[in-house]
Amino acid sequence: MAFIAALGIFMAGICPAVLCFPNGTLGRDTAVQEDQDNGTQVDSLTLASINTDFAFSLYKELALKNPDKNIVFSPLSISAALAIVSLGAKCNTLQEILEGLKFNLTETPEADIHLGFRHLLHMLSQSGKEEQINIAVSMFIEKHLQILAEFQEKVRSLYQAEAFTADFQQADEARKFINDYVRKETQGKIQELLSDLVERTSMVLVNYIYFKGKWKMPFDPRVTLKSEFYLDEKRSVKVPMMKIEDLTTPYFRDEELSCSVVELKYIGNASALFILPDQGRIEQVEASLQPETLRKWKDSLRPRKIDLLYLPKFLVSTDYSLEDVLSELGIKEVFSAQADLSRVTGTKDLSVSQVVHKAMLEVAEKGTEAAAATGVKFVFRSGRVPTMTVRFDRPFLMVVSHTGVESILFLAKVTNPN
């Protein structure tokens, strides 16, 4: 069982801040109104490739700023939140956001980008009973602020946004209200999203994604044992190491990049790609991350019998402020006094003050549902030397994707499972 949750937060206010909604609560629009489309959405594969490009660009910046640390984030959560902000932007502010998300505006009209996101989010919401994927946008708005009706309608119809009013003059009460909401929506996995509120906050945009999946071939918790995980050539830590024998699963050995790629499938429409660089080669693999690399790995996967597969049981959580990272990707003006977010309220006195992203990734034999391993028998045979062993006992990468829309839900690097 794997559980993953991520939250993206945009702090907003007048001068130091961003979005707003009128008084009252706006519910999610559950229907996808195809008959109201006046354009053509970006097709799923094109959007997936663009999102992958953004995901790897963001990953490289995070890895640069957080060397030798665990990394986990949801590129889809971040890109969807930025796309929503772009609905309120104009001129250079708008161009920077969409180009920072890796869209070519000479090839793809702005309206088509949002239709593509709407279709993607709708497809992800159609998860089956064996998997759980919840992705949603919620806005908490200062009760005295008003926004343009056109912006309000676009956010609602394109991104199914749910909005609430809050009194940010009572900062502690507003923070508790938001934290309680997030705790409930993530089933208690994110306990405290906000530790404080930026001064003069007028809006908090929360974009969250929650994924819970069962392995098609679960690990047997009875054979999970403490084992060495090598942080580098000189240091190691003891971690709970899961094991599975006689597993047939998609596998590819990339000799060019000196890494092994193993795909483990979830029941339903999701899979996890584990990339294990050879000792000392993780930086080489990270530098090569681009849509073409991921496509090569996926196209090269072939069913392979692995006699022994070892994978650490781990829980990784991260907390990022993304303003500097996004600025490195060209998204700068929205954080400055020059920001033009006049499609939100009709004035230019808004800017984004803070972008916070929290994510949690848990990989285990099974989750809270004991049925994950029901009916699965493992045969342990003695007296035979395994012909192939894959041991994730050093830093590795993990890509969780939705196979139906070919989009990356989560991207992670595990440098220390503890």
From Swiss-Prot:
The keyword Secreted applies. Transmembrane segments: none annotated. Residues 1-28 form the signal peptide. InterPro entries: Serpin_CS, Serpin_dom, Serpin_fam, Serpin_sf, Serpin_sf_1, Serpin_sf_2. GO terms for cellular component: extracellular space. It is found in: Secreted. One of its GO terms (molecular function) is serine-type endopeptidase inhibitor activity. Glycans are attached at residues 23, 38, 104, 269. Its main location: secreted. Keywords: Glycoprotein, Protease inhibitor, Secreted, Serine protease inhibitor, Signal. The keyword Nucleus does not apply. It comes from the Eukaryota. The record marks 381-382 as: Reactive bond. Pfam families: Serpin. PANTHER family: SERINE PROTEASE INHIBITOR A3A-RELATED, SERINE PROTEASE INHIBITOR, SERPIN. Belongs to the serpin family. This is Serine proteinase inhibitor 2.4. It comes from Apodemus sylvaticus (European woodmouse). The lineage of its organism: Eukaryota, Metazoa, Chordata, Craniata, Vertebrata.
